[in-house]
């Protein structure tokens, strides 16, 4: 936080467990998937407040927030569970600087009976149930992630240009400017253009976009979910393609 972060999320690890345990193997593969996602996101839409190397976790005792940042977002959201995730979304909504630091680590139990309704123990039980029936967890297709992050970067540039006071001659010109981005996001151009002009932060704009496109993706999403192992392989391929040749 001395470097300017408003919040820091640490890596959450479990104590050494039997590597032959199917649930443990699934947990490690899921962690690999999410770290690779974070690396691909960095390559496509880098965040100066959260550079690579980074991870993906901001939960429970691993999440620290400055007093000023906590006050700015209105404190801990009143939700029945996953209040840490709700707090993270509030930080993002206000464009606060969140760092996922690999240098911060906390350790927790891998028990499958926890104290909260939805948490790590719940996730471990979900994986155990899937594996018991011979199924592999399904996750987002890397092609969808690539489109998602590339479009988010374009939208952020458009929002910043608009916030900087760049003149737009007519409503038609504004709609033309957001048209390609709106098409990629599956949202109506007039609605997107209105939100671009009205949103006080990019996080507020992106939260609106996410809410609008969830229903569209559920019914019109072009990319199916993939088994976890296949998604990890594709993420590795995409990262290798995007990394500088020297590496």
Regions found by a protein language model. Name each.
Residues 1-28:
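Conserved donor NDP-sugar-binding/catalytic core segment of glycosyltransferases
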Residues 27-55:
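Short, flexible, basic/aromatic active-site loop/helix in glycosyltransferases
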Residues 43, 57-74:
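Conserved nucleotide-sugar donor-binding
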Residues 62, 80, 98-99:
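A residue-level structural signature of the nucleotidyltransferase/glycosyltransferase Rossmann-like core
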Residues 81-87, 101:
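Acidic donor-binding loop at a coil-to-helix junction in glycosyltransferase catalytic cores
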Residues 90-92, 97:
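Hydrophobic residues within well-ordered alpha-helices
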Residues 102-118:
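Active-site donor/metal-binding and catalytic loop motifs
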Residues 129-247:
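Terminal low-complexity segments of carbohydrate-biosynthetic enzymes
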